[in-house]
């Protein structure tokens, strides 16, 4: 054999050795912090390897280095080795076939013997350290059987199941024999020996957030185990056996038997498992449905025996007793005694039942009285809260309704004073008292005007912030499963940047350096566009910086800073600089879109949008705007519509909860509900004549029909709740009362005759749906999602 052939054979031997190393390494569980086991075994046989030439040794060392480097896989590869360690087992016959294919040589045969001895020792040491572990997943009860080394820490087993279950390893716990195993412990520390079968449980410490579920794809997967088979007198061989979990029996399709060896060979069958035939239900048959009764008397047998004294037989009489007959009583006496006992039982039962009945009545009465007391307390509490709210609105007016309420109180006070003056004074004294009354009224009106100005400034700042929040809000979509999707566009991001700059400008208590930084940021932002507005803003910024450098006090710069903020807000409201704001401006950029929505106010002589006019359902033309109507009310009548607004809002909420596409109720305006309450129902309940508007509600007369002015009734809240529980109006009310209600409905239908025609034009109008959705009570459950921490 030539030297080249020897080198070639040695290289093939080393390569095959490396492959066998890799195959056998899948049986062991290499730990990253420890050295591979093959190194110790290899060092013991260095003397055998040194028999080769120097070139052969260098080549073998290079290959062994590569094999050692392959022993450092990641965690996933490590756990794959733990799960199926015996799928790639070492078979000496396979290597013997490979070695037999090569040309025999004395040196190569010696080297092969050394390699075989090393691998057999490694295989025995690894196989001896393995134990069969049955892992049970709690609470699903899934069982997974895997081989695992008894001297390997349990951290690798926990990491593997953490990867399969998608649960952090810190949440998983391993339990063996009722004890919780730690990560740095091994099975040997708990008395588990090699080749044993143990059962451990894996569960989650936080089942609500990280539940343990079944691992798909493992129940039907076959398992491979190694079985030791005796092949000779003192010879044993390990054979891999695959366990297939299937209850399907292969059908016998014929075959033949070898005459010499006696081995049976079956014909091939299909691997498709046939469909399971469903079990048929038990069917019972009977001849007829007629039941036959049979009455037979039968006397049961009773075996008895007697023992008499006799010669040779002794019977003890120590336990005998003398029985004497009692007093005889007839059947009538017996039945009379039973009847007397029954009467006694009935007497005591009826007494007990009467006590229970009276106790139930007493308890129901106490509950009823307690409920009535709570209702009275609730009404008193609501009245007190209404008075407190009234007092708070008088002293801290903020909305238009509050000032409307103040003017109403002023008019009520003026009427009382006027009546008192007319009754108490005459002539010159009356004129002097009227002049004094007029002066007081003027002072009160001036005070109300000052409060209105303060509230207007506060509301204006809040309106500006709400406007900026609306412009910078992201786009929101609601998915069918209840979740929301938010998306920011380049326009919303631009609007948010301008909003942040505006907030920084409006800050009060900041240092001079911080103010200079804000002005510098504003200057760079405004410089992007050149126009008259931006030029004026830049001049004001330079002026403020110059004054600050000269040491001007802050309170002297308030006017200049307010002017800068006002101009910058106009800058934000310009669609050229902030495109997102174009959707929320009252005056659109395209005049044609605004052409058909402008109306002329005959009072203030202004052209205003349609939203500035209050239109009743019975109106025939548009005459005056809202501001003119409110101004006329404050100057002349000074009426308060707050209670009517509450009544109308309660009607909106009630009709929105019906969800029957009612539209007439949402067409009713404040003037309509006022006319309906005052002129049709006389501002009082039909049943109890209660005239407290804060306690009255307007509900449907017939709850199966849509609400309308000719299908409503004015009742208190308690009466309305009882009215809506009626199943039939004819059974709940008298005929005279029903006739009275229908007469009022006819009056309302004549006055609101245009409402049905108006409702027919807005069947497909989306504004009604928006109003209904605004007052609809949201009862859908909130979905809270738990976000898992990253692995």
Swiss-Prot record:
- Asked if the Swiss-Prot or TrEMBL record annotates the protein with the keyword Cytoplasm, the reply is yes
> Gene3D superfamilies, per this entry?
Phosphatidylinositol 3-kinase Catalytic Subunit, Chain A, domain 1
| Annotated localization | Cytoplasm, Cytoskeleton, Flagellum axoneme; Cell projection, Cilium
Q: Tell me the impact of changing residue 735 to H.
A: In a colorectal cancer sample; somatic mutation
Entry keyword set:
Cell projection, Cilium, Cilium biogenesis/degradation, Cytoplasm, Cytoskeleton, Disease variant, Flagellum
Q: Which residue ranges does UniProt annotate as crossing the membrane?
A: none
Q: Which GO terms describe its biological process?
A: cilium assembly; flagellated sperm motility; mating; smoothened signaling pathway
The record's listing under PROSITE patterns reads: UBIQUITIN_2 (PS50053)
**Record domain Ubiquitin-like: where:** 131-207
Q: Which domain of life is it from?
A: Eukaryota
InterPro entries, alphabetized: IQUB, Ubiquitin-like_dom, Ubiquitin-like_domsf
Which cellular component terms (GO) are annotated to the entry? 9+2 motile cilium; acrosomal vesicle; motile cilium; radial spoke; sperm flagellum
Which cysteines link up through disulfide bonds?
none
Q: Does the keyword Cytoplasm apply?
A: yes
Q: Which SUPFAM superfamilies match?
A: Ubiquitin-like (SSF54236)
IQ domain span: 338-367
Q: Which purpose does this protein serve, as stated in its record? A: Adapter protein that anchors the radial spoke 1 (RS1) complex to the A microtubule of outer doublet microtubules in axonemes. The triple radial spokes (RS1, RS2 and RS3) are required to modulate beating of the sperm flagellum. May play a role in inhibiting signaling via MAPK1/ERK2 and MAPK3/ERK1. Additionally, may play a role in the functioning of cilia. Not required for the functioning of tracheal or ependymal cilia.
Quote the subunit structure annotation. Component of the axonemal radial spoke 1 (RS1) complex, at least composed of spoke head proteins RSPH1, RSPH3, RSPH9 and the cilia-specific component RSPH4A or sperm-specific component RSPH6A, spoke stalk proteins RSPH14, DNAJB13, DYDC1, ROPN1L and NME5, and the anchor protein IQUB. Does not appear to be part of radial spoke complexes 2 or 3 (RS2 or RS3). Interacts with CALM1. Interacts with DNAJB13. Interacts with DYNLL2. Interacts with NME5. Interacts with RSPH3. Interacts with RSPH9. Interacts with ZMYND10.
> What name is this protein filed under?
IQ motif and ubiquitin-like domain-containing protein
What gene does this protein come from?
A: IQUB
């Amino acid at each position: 054999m030539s030297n080249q052939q020897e080198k070639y054979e040695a290289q093939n031997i080393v390569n095959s050795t490396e492959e066998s190393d890799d195959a056998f390494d899948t049986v062991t569980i290499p730990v990253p912090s420890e050295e591979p086991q093959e190194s110790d075994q290899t060092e013991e046989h260095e003397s055998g390897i040194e028999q080769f030439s120097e070139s052969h040794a260098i080549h073998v060392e290079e290959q062994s280095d590569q094999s050692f480097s392959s022993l450092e896989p990641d965690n996933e590869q490590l756990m794959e080795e733990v799960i199926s360690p015996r799928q790639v087992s070492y078979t000496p016959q396979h290597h013997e076939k490979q070695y037999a294919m090569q040309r025999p040589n004395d040196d190569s045969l010696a080297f092969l013997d050394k390699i075989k001895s090393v691998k057999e020792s490694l295989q025995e040491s690894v196989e001896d350290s393995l134990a069969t572990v049955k892992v049970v997943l709690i609470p699903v009860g899934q069982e997974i059987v895997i081989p695992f080394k008894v001297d390997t820490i349990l951290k690798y087993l926990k990491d593997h199941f953490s990867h399969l279950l998608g649960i952090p390893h810190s949440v998983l716990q391993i339990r063996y024999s009722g004890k919780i195993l730690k990560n740095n412990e091994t099975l040997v520390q708990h008395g588990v020996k090699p080749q044993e079968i143990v059962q451990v449980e894996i569960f989650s410490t936080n089942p609500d957030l990280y539940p343990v579920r079944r691992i798909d794809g493992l129940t039907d997967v076959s398992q491979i185990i190694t079985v030791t088979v005796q092949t000779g007198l003192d010879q044993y061989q390990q054979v891999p056996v695959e366990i297939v979990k299937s209850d399907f029996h292969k059908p016998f399709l014929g075959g033949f038997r070898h005459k010499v060896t006696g081995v049976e060979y079956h014909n091939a069958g299909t691997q498709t498992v046939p469909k399971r035939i469903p079990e048929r239900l038990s069917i019972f048959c009977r001849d007829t449905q007629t039941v036959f009764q049979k009455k037979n008397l039968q006397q049961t047998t009773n075996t008895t025996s007697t023992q008499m004294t006799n010669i040779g037989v002794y019977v003890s009489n120590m336990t005998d007793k003398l029985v004497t007959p009692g007093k005889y009583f007839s059947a009538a006496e017996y039945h009379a005694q039973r009847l007397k006992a029954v009467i006694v039982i009935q007497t005591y039962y009826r007494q007990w039942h009467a006590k229970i009945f009276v106790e139930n009545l007493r308890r129901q009465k106490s509950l009823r009285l307690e409920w009535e007391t709570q209702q009275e307390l609730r009404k008193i509490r609501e009245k007190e809260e209404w008075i407190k709210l009234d007092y708070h609105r008088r002293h801290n007016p903020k909305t238009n309704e509050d000032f409307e309420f103040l003017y109403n109180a002023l008019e009520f006070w003026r009427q009382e004073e006027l009546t008192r003056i007319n009754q108490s004074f005459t002539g010159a004294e009356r004129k002097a008292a009227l002049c004094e009354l007029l002066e007081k009224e003027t002072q009160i009106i001036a005070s109300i005007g000052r409060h209105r100005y303060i509230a207007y400034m506060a509301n204006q700042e809040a309106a500006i912030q709400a406007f900026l929040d609306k412009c910078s809000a992201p786009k929101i979509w609601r998915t069918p499963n209840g979740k929301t999707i938010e998306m920011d566009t380049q326009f919303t991001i631009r609007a948010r940047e301008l909003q942040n700059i505006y907030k920084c400008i409006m800050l009060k208590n900041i240092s001079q350096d911080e103010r200079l930084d804000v002005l510098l940021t504003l200057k760079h932002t405004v410089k992007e566009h050149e126009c008259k507005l931006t030029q004026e803003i830049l001049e004001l910024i330079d002026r403020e910086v110059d004054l600050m450098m000269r040491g001007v006090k802050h309170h002297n710069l308030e006017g200049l800073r307010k002017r800068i903020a006002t101009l910058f807000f106009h800058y934000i409201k310009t669609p050229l600089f902030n495109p997102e704001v174009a959707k929320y401006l009252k005056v659109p950029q395209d005049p044609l879109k605004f052409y058909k929505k402008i109306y002329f106010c005959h009072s203030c002589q202004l052209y205003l949008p349609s939203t500035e006019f209050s239109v009743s359902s019975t109106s025939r033309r548009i005459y005056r705007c809202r501001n003119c109507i409110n101004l006329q009310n404050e100057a002349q009548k000074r009426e308060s519509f707050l209670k009517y607004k509450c009544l109308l809002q309660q009607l909106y909420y009630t009709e929105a909860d019906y969800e029957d596409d009612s539209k007439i109720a949402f067409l009713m305006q404040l003037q309509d509900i006022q006319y309906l309450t005052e002129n049709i129902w006389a501002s009082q309940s039909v049943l109890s004549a209660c005239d407290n508007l804060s306690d009255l509600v307007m509900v449907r007369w017939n709850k199966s029909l849509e609400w309308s002015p000719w299908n409503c009734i004015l009742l208190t809240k308690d009466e309305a709740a009882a009215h809506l529980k009626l199943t039939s109006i004819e059974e709940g009310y008298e005929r005279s009362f029903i006739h009275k209600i229908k007469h009022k409905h006819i009056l309302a239908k004549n006055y609101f005759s245009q409402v049905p025609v108006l409702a027919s034009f807005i069947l497909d109008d989306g504004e009604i749906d928006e109003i209904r959705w605004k007052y609809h009570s949201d009862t859908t459950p909130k979905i809270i999602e738990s976000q898992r921490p990253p692995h």
